[in-house]
């Protein structure tokens, strides 16, 4: 039987998942997105050419791979069409390779308007959303008033449902947020113009994946954002609106939970975060600036500067627990090149002076936390593009080994550059 592998982030997103998914799809037959929306930003560099994907799975660039958007994804028709056009203009036959669950909730213009209005109303307490309507779309889904891809099969019913839900949301926009109403006729016309394209890509995803599993095809599940942004297990309320953890694979795709064989956690060699929220190891000094500059830490989706800091092994251990991680892929090791010393957070000192090795559950619990560091020697040699473990400086190997020791999880893959070729696979997830 074929192996089913999950690839997800262990931190606050931006760990480098896209490149690793693209690399591993050389063997996969299917790549599945199971949560999030076009708030994700997965950057791939292949033969020097850069591709940024927000909604379509990273496997779309491979000709023998089927890409699937599962029911756990909130789908913006406008964003999908834009992304499809960009890929098709470059010669990728997206409509032959991409399929969509009819249960995907739709993100429409009023969701974006609500997202923006709410962030503005929060003022200094803004969460730092991407402003793309993700949260309001998930809210509609849970409230059972959301429109889904499958609703487009009956255009008259869709129009009636849209009118009802827009009356509700426009009332909020105008009377509570003092914002402009969203035009119903425009929203309807925009969706109807591409409805047939969307419905033409619909499949029964659960049935498709179960058949693939029984045939022994290799399936990869591509996570978006990161564990610490999970709606339930993240730094609430500074989180995204979906389950970014491994548990979201089954609910967001329709595959049974027993059929996940290996969970690969992507861990950046240091920490970054976009937007507001707790970040115990954040650096505000020259080292923080160094990490930002060397790592080109600007969001692929928003362009915002990412906050930077040392690797937080306490937070990563939480990701190990929640996701039952099988192994790590460490990315951006080369960004640490040239530092005289490298620090690793192994515990927290609480405001009362006590030391803990677990993370708080709510954002308030993080207040006043001080990181407790181990300091390791840095290295002056370059690790960029190194393709063998023996080719790494001894200090870099010692750092990797220490991360393995404090987390209890092996580093199975090491990324030393943005190109898919700049990677060493010590243990292939599909063979583990």
From Swiss-Prot:
Pathway: Purine metabolism; AMP biosynthesis via de novo pathway; AMP from IMP: step 1/2
Active site: 14 (proton acceptor), 42 (proton donor)
Any GO CC annotation of this UniProt entry: cytoplasm
GO molecular function annotation: adenylosuccinate synthase activity; GTP binding; magnesium ion binding
Subcellular location: Cytoplasm
Annotated residues for binding of Mg(2+): 14, 41
Annotated substrate binding sites: 300-306
Reported cofactor(s): Mg(2+)
One Gene Ontology term from the biological process aspect of the record: 'de novo' AMP biosynthetic process
Cofactor note: Binds 1 Mg(2+) ion per subunit.
EC category name: ligase
Cystine pairs: none
Binding of GTP, residues: 13-19, 41-43, 306, 332-334, 415-417
One Pfam family linked to the record: Adenylsucc_synt
Reactions catalysed, as given in the entry: IMP + L-aspartate + GTP = N(6)-(1,2-dicarboxyethyl)-AMP + GDP + phosphate + 2 H(+)
Assigned keywords, A-Z: Cytoplasm, GTP-binding, Ligase, Magnesium, Metal-binding, Nucleotide-binding, Purine biosynthesis
EC number: 6.3.4.4
Family: Belongs to the adenylosuccinate synthetase family.
Function: Plays an important role in the de novo pathway of purine nucleotide biosynthesis. Catalyzes the first committed step in the biosynthesis of AMP from IMP.
Entries under HAMAP family matching the protein: Adenylosucc_synth
PANTHER family the record matches: ADENYLOSUCCINATE SYNTHETASE (PTHR11846:SF0)
Subunit (UniProt): Homodimer.
Name this protein carries in UniProt: Adenylosuccinate synthetase
Name of the gene this protein is made from: purA
